[in-house]
């Protein structure tokens, strides 16, 4: 690619290459879905038809075919990883029968820890531990109470090169690699990530708040392109970079954008526990800085 990876540029490239398997970060699939799928199914009549047994299945198949075609049309499955996949987007992919799966890993594990074939994908999970890899949730109740995800096996590194201190904080004496991620695991071994332990926030009364879960909901709200949830004192604030294409199309002013964000805040709060509700949404004037895998560099914004 010689241009910025916009949905249009990506779809053109994939149409040319026609890959047999895709491994992508969530940002890519979310952009393509919002560009190629959502505009076609937002109509109230279409939503109603999609709920009807026979007609609905036909529409879903057509939507799935369109999305498959937009991604080259030649792949066995799309493997998504590197960050959390938006729950609403995933539920849509699952509902239309799209061939996707979500994996989880780390560089220290070369890099895969969990994976499921698309035929066994469970919505919200990142699969089960791969062959030769043990996995454990460090929690008294791994099904219901999030704990740190630990793993050991042939994929796990021996240690960090010439850094015994870092190795000692990550690998324990029993060979378990401490991922720093928090999650739960169901009876079948499917892992559900809640967020990073270092990202977890504490409410005024000691409640655990996972900002990623709030961000997942906020990212589905009107005009939201990218978002972060941060703590300012004891208050939670949503940082939002708005969708510039929509702003231009609708001819929105700054006051219009502020009003939409306040409406978003009022709409999202009833779906959150009282201790996790947003007190404000701040509009950012430029995109968030990101890592090479397109995750937002959270540490740059949490201390402002």
Task: List where the protein language model places each region.
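Conserved C-terminal "lid"/linker of ANL adenylate-forming enzymes
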Residues: 226, 234, 265-304
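C-terminal boundary motif of the adenylate-forming
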Residues: 138, 182, 220-244, 269
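Residue-level signal for inorganic ion chemistry
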Residues: 22, 82, 135, 189, ...
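Gly/Ser/Thr-rich phosphate-binding loop
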Residues: 20-23, 33-121, 134, 224-225
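Conserved ATP-binding/catalytic segment of the ANL
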Residues: 129, 143-144, 148-203
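ATP-dependent adenylate-forming carboxylate-activation enzymes
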Residues: 1-17, 209-214
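Short hydrophobic/charged patches on amphipathic alpha-helices used for structural packing
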Residues: 11, 64-67, 168, 215
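Adenylate-forming
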Residues: 156, 190-219, 246-256, 272-278
């Amino acid at each position: 690619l010689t241009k910025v990876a916009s949905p249009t540029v990506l779809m053109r490239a994939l149409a040319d290459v026609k890959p047999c398997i895709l491994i992508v970060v969530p940002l890519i699939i979310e952009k393509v879905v919002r560009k190629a799928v959502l505009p076609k199914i937002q109509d109230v009549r279409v939503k109603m038809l999609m709920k009807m047994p026979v007609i609905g299945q036909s529409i879903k198949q057509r939507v799935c075919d369109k999305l498959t075609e937009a991604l080259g049309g030649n792949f066995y499955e799309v493997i998504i990883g590197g960050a959390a996949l938006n729950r609403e987007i995933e539920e849509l992919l699952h509902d239309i029968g799209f061939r996707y799966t979500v994996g989880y890993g780390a560089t220290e594990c070369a890099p895969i820890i969990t994976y499921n074939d698309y035929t066994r994908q469970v919505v919200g999970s990142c699969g089960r531990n791969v062959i030769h890899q043990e996995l454990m949730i460090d929690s008294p109740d791994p099904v219901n109470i999030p704990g740190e995800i630990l793993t050991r096996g042939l994929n796990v590194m021996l240690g960090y090169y010439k850094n015994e201190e870092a190795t000692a904080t990550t690998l324990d004496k029993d060979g378990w690699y401490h991922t720093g991620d928090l999650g739960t695991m169901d009876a079948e071994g499917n892992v559900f990530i809640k967020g990073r332990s270092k990202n977890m926030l504490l409410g005024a009364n000691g409640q655990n708040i996972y900002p990623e879960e709030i961000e997942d909901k906020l990212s589905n709200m009107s005009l939201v392109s990218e978002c972060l949830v941060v703590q300012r004192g004891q208050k939670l604030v949503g940082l939002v970079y708005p969708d510039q294409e929509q702003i231009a199309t609708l001819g929105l002013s700054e006051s219009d954008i502020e009003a939409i964000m306040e409406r978003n805040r009022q709409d999202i709060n009833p779906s959150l526990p009282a201790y996790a509700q947003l007190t404000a949404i701040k509009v950012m004037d430029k995109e968030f800085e990101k890592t090479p895998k397109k995750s937002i560099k959270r540490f740059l914004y949490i201390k402002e």
